[in-house]
Amino acid sequence: MDVTAKYELIGLMAYPIRHSLSPEMQNKALEKAGLPFTYMAFEVDNDSFPGAIEGLKALKMRGTGVSMPNKQLACEYVDELTPAAKLVGAINTIVNDDGYLRGYNTDGTGHIRAIKESGFDIKGKTMVLLGAGGASTAIGAQGAIEGLKEIKLFNRRDEFFDKALAFAQRVNENTDCVVTVTDLADQQAFAEALASADILTNGTKVGMKPLENESLVNDISLLHPGLLVTECVYNPHMTKLLQQAQQAGCKTIDGYGMLLWQGAEQFTLWTGKDFPLEYVKQVMGFGA
């Protein structure tokens, strides 16, 4: 790719960032489509995020992806949020239109799209959702919008627990889905929730390097063949949770599905063009 002065810059702001496959994926897509953009990753944490947004405006960047730990903070630095992003309380995409910043969340639509593409119908189903960060709440919100009957959210009593309660209230007030929040330390409640669940989704960092040998499911017998187990983590590709799920006879969806579909939507938001999906799946080794 020959980058010229006509090229516009798209960023990714996160910390840590070295593990991300998004720059490779987006740049391959941009090159295939012949579009005058280049995508670069920047190590940005909560402390440096405000300055990074000022830099985005000053450099007239087309926009940026936003990942951990900035997804919730980023809502405070855009001029407009989509209705879904307001429901989530977090964004992963910013589009810059001449200094006017719009915030979107494609994590939820991407993950739910990956589930649907597998042939699974979420309408009327119950999801056990692990975590209350930006990815988890995005998945929960989109699932509620698209027809989940119930979401049983489990999170440790950390700084995200109150945010989880607020998220549940927003979803309960604005959709037909019923969301409950329970301390993950309550293993009896966790076991009971899994027994009646249709979907288990991990939206936490547990399973991601350097936590690749960990899983929030301590007892594999809690998993049953009728359960669909989905993962947000894609590095490593086969997390411990997915290994447990396959051993238990569950159908699984790895983190590549969410990465692909959320990235496809981002691509269109930034460029106005269709994402070369089949090409990217092939060159990135994401499979069918």
Curated annotation (Swiss-Prot):
Changing Y39F: Kinetically unchanged as compared with the wild-type. It comes from the Bacteria. It catalyses: L-quinate + NAD(+) = 3-dehydroquinate + NADH + H(+); L-quinate + NADP(+) = 3-dehydroquinate + NADPH + H(+); shikimate + NADP(+) = 3-dehydroshikimate + NADPH + H(+); shikimate + NAD(+) = 3-dehydroshikimate + NADH + H(+). Induction: Induced under carbon limitation but not under phosphate limitation. Its EC number is 1.1.1.282. Substrate binds at K71, D107. Pathway: Metabolic intermediate biosynthesis; chorismate biosynthesis; chorismate from D-erythrose 4-phosphate and phosphoenolpyruvate: step 4/7. Changing D107A: Loss of activity towards quinate. 20000-fold decrease in the affinity for shikimate. It is an enzyme of class 1 (oxidoreductase). Changing S22A: Kinetically unchanged as compared with the wild-type. NAD(+) binds at A132, G133, G134, A135, N155, R156, R157, D158, K205, C232, V233, Y234, N235, G255. GO terms for biological process: amino acid biosynthetic process; aromatic amino acid family biosynthetic process; chorismate biosynthetic process; shikimate metabolic process. CDD domains: NAD_bind_Shikimate_DH (cd01065). Keywords: Amino-acid biosynthesis, Aromatic amino acid biosynthesis, NAD, NADP, Oxidoreductase. Disulfide bonds: none annotated. One of its GO terms (molecular function) is shikimate 3-dehydrogenase (NADP+) activity. HAMAP family: Shikimate_DH_AroE, Shikimate_DH_YdiB. Homodimer. Belongs to the shikimate dehydrogenase family. The actual biological function of YdiB remains unclear, nor is it known whether 3-dehydroshikimate or quinate represents the natural substrate. Catalyzes the reversible NAD-dependent reduction of both 3-dehydroshikimate (DHSA) and 3-dehydroquinate to yield shikimate (SA) and quinate, respectively. It can use both NAD or NADP for catalysis, however it has higher catalytic efficiency with NAD. This is Quinate/shikimate dehydrogenase. It comes from Escherichia coli (strain K12).
